[in-house]
Amino acid sequence: MDFVFMLTRNDATVENALDLVEVARRLALKHIGFKDVGAETAKLRRLTAAIREAGAAVWMEVVSTSRDDELRSIALARDLGVDWLMGGVHAEEGLRILSGSAIRYLPFAGRPCGHPTVLDGAPAEVEAHCRAFAAMGCAGVDILAYRATEAEPLDLVAACRRGFSPPGTVVVAGSINSADRIAAVRAAGADAFTIGTAAIEAFYAPGAGPLEAQLKAILADCRAAE
């Protein structure tokens, strides 16, 4: 299972994101990402370059709440040349914007709302969304399982796996804050998970120390979940 370190707090890219990339570089993290909100385009360009220089895949998650802002962010992701694009709800339009690029697109399943984002929707709806995404040609799905308002988190992860068979990628984003949750989402069928705030604020592993120690703890728990 893959760990995607998000340079974010409360669903926005943090001001010192470039400094955090240097910490991640020391640990040879393979996946590093940011949100489409919280930083200007010029900074996102610098972040994309820095992540690539660190030897990691570049991830971007779209959390903008309006259709127009979402589609602008998808176009920006194409311009930046990220490797993975998560989020957004207008999958057909997103795929058209990304057509011809190598970007792997994982839209939200369920009904995300607000910012920071929460997730409405039952497992049957999430599974149906995933089947539709697979038929469209999406690379996978982004599920805010632990932000759910209408279902048990692991039921949503399992619904994604039923609806999107391998090699489709199921990524659990948001509120992964313990080894137990990493192991649980893996058992439910997830291929990857994201952590931002819990690492940056140093409450993933209380008492372990600042960011580098937090990331080491997450990596160890990720390996243990395999």
Please provide the spans of the model-predicted regions.
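Catalytic cores of alpha/beta
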Residues: R67-D79, D83, G121-A128, D155, ...
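Conserved N-terminal beta1-alpha1 strand-loop-helix module at the mouth
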Residues: M1-W59, T65-D68, I74-G81, R131-M136, ...
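Charged helix-capping and loop-helix junction motifs
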Residues: R45, D120-A128, A151-A158, A208-Q214
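Hydrophobic faces of well-ordered beta-strands that scaffold small-molecule active sites
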Residues: F3-T8, K30-F34, V58-V62, W84-G87, ...
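Glycine-rich phosphate-binding active-site loops on the catalytic face of alpha/beta enzymes
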Residues: L80-E93, M136-E150, S175-R181, R186-L211
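Conserved anion-binding
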Residues: G55, V63, R67-T149, G163, ...
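A generic structural signal for well-ordered alpha-helical segments
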Residues: A24, I51, L98, R161-F164
